[in-house]
Amino acid sequence: MIKPHGSALLNPLFVADDQERQQLLLEAEILPSLLLNSAAAANAVMLGAGYFNPLTGYMNLADALNVAANLHTTEGLFWPVPIVNLVVDPSGIKGANRIALRDPNTDGHPVMAVMDVDAIEAVSDEQIEMMAQEIFGTLDPEHPGVGTFTQLGRNLVSGNIRVLSLSYFQADFPDTFRTAAEIRNDIAQRGWQKVVAFQTRNPMHRAHEELCHMAMKRLEADGVVVHMLLGKLKQGDIPASVRDDCIRKMVELYFPENTVMVTGYGFDMLYAGPREAVLHAVFRQNMGCSHLIVGRDHAGVGDYYGAFDAQTIFAEKVPAGALDIAIFNADHTAFSTKLNRVVMMNEVEDHSKEDFILLSGTKVRQMLGDGIAPPPEFARPEVAKILMDYYQQESA
């Protein structure tokens, strides 16, 4: 099986031993507390679940700046996006060597982790802007990632953490949320060697379904891991529970048995396009996948990125040997009325735009909200029904 990124063995930061975890929770009650923002809490979940292996905590300012500018930590580890804990007001933890990190997304703000504080560093507006420009490729405050990142605070708290809770994900998504270690173990138990990861923050339609089939066939893969984002998205996106239902229904009806694992991870979408695509590759390698499907406008939003920027970054910015995972580059997939099947649009000749069934996300949402099923060439009827029920309930 493919090795984790940056180490021989996966090292999740979640404290699995019950007794040790209880002791740390008791200790945390008397430590100075820091209520995390949602972005830092998402980072803690990913660190705890082993997805951000081999990191041992939040980056310091030198590492964060170097990762943003050069895609490497100061010690030379390849990493695409700063993993940071930015704070607006650090006065409550000033001078503390050890602190409790509290969960902003769960009632009562329970302890998520215990942190050994290395430093609390002031971050200038110029440094925040430099990082935002490098990560997102823009400083437009309308960009959802930029809007979030630039408001997180100007104090960077760095240090190693021991994770004591994976937030609400295990309770809310018991059948879907999985740690990198759990997925890696499941892949090993199935005896899969060549494994394709499919990233999604949306319900899967015919084009996505066929893309997974194509990747499996062309790579002669043993299976696909559909890995859905369960954390925070932007306003108007479909909730994780509805997406989960749609994907499970599609897999149940339209994939051969025992060829697909449906799983999810707890992270907030960055909408960082190319940089986020590389981060996706890092943590799919950590969970044991040999390939990642990267499609058109992967992890993008609006018109901020070129359609294939998330593919070209792997050739242009990722040094040879930095990652073991391979990328399966995909063009836009759509149903061809000429060929009566889903195709990659760049692979068929004698087609004009009118020969494909193409619907924008806005158009699909409008149809579903009006109780109109998209054509079966675009969405499986069983999936469309789940979505129509959701939209009509929302508008009731």
Residue ranges of model-derived segments:
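Active-site cores that bind ATP or allylic diphosphates and position pyrophosphate for catalysis
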Residues: 1-396
